[in-house]
Amino acid sequence: MTTASKKITFKEPTTKRLDIFFTEKFKISRTQAQKMIEENNILINNKISTKTGHPLKTGDTIAIEKKPIIKPPAPKKYDVKVAPKKIPKIKVITVTKDYIVVEKPNGLLTHSTDKNEPDSLAAILVKKYPELKKVGDDPKRPGIVHRLDKEASGLLVVARTQKMFDHLKNQFKERTVEKEYSVLVHGKVAKDWDEIKFPIERSRNKDRMAALPATLRGAATIEGKNALTEFWVEQRFINFTLLRVKIHTGRMHQVRVHMLSYNSPVVGDPLYFQKKQKDKWDKVCGRLFLHCIHLAFTDLKGDKQEFKSELPPELVNFLPLLK
């Protein structure tokens, strides 16, 4: 059903087309005017006109019919289920009454930062081992004595008691804990073995560290924290080298910043890289090629505890692509 909303009667002579009249009268486009006519909204002398080019003459009466607005049915509401965030799985290597040794997966923080991230290795372990909440010297790092970068993976020890925490903390301070990594770097490293001794300090970019250059006499040009990294070549590829890396100090991002200073940045590193070396292989790898393969420390009895870890499948499968 329609209701007339407006009528126009031509008293003056006119020879305009119907569509042109509407464009001038209502300041609309020719297309809009033609659409009104074609949708049977216009009556000329009480007869529906669908001809856009209908010629108007003196005495013609135009009625613009306003059709009732029929609202389309509201779309059905469906409960949208958001898939839960996939958290990398933690592999537990061993559990004792004093400590837990795990393999931290790539992509997971060791502990939350000042941003209070909800997902971390520490948070996951606390759910399974609630006693960890009382261990350590920082509530954000329950039981955590050392850490692995979020992008890295591999072995990590977590203290279950305060006594073990203090015992491990002292070993790290005395630098008696053994940590070795499997690391793939850009470029063909010439030496089968070498040491990197550049001191490390925080860069102007707060997210980065920097290896400080040394003078000809071997002293750092700027004061920084002493750092020592030792490596052995495991395998050479055309443009890459697989290394076994041992760190004798535990500076933040030590392996990554030292390898960058050695002109051999770690493959897949989103933070420490050289533009000329970053290529498609970093994307193909899909992650930082740095995995802690060896960890050794002494327990409360003074016995040496040693653990080894194999490269994860994604890194094992990546290496043959480089041959």
Q: How would you describe each model-predicted region?
A:
Residues 2-323:
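RNA pseudouridine synthases
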